[in-house]
């Protein structure tokens, strides 16, 4: 069953840009999954369960995400 949520216009426009041909549900599932995976990665690093190669790959991915987020500009209303 579908649910209705209310979000700010600027958030809506950013989600529209991000989703491409996906549904909003697909996009939100993907973002939630990344957040959960991100939390697991933090725990794995904290407890030293990553190989040096995995740590380097994570650093690369984090840099890419940081650059991607820096490229965002607030939507004009």
Curated annotation (Swiss-Prot):
Disulfide-bonded cysteines: none
Domain of life of the organism encoding this protein: Archaea
Alphabetically ordered keywords of this record: Toxin-antitoxin system
Pfam families the UniProt entry points to: VAPB_antitox
Similarity comment: Belongs to the UPF0330 family.
NCBIfam families: PRK13696.1-2
Entry function: Possibly the antitoxin component of a type II toxin-antitoxin (TA) system.
Name under which the protein is recorded: Putative antitoxin TK1752
Originating organism: Thermococcus kodakarensis (strain ATCC BAA-918 / JCM 12380 / KOD1)
Lineage: Archaea, Methanobacteriati, Methanobacteriota, Thermococci, Thermococcales
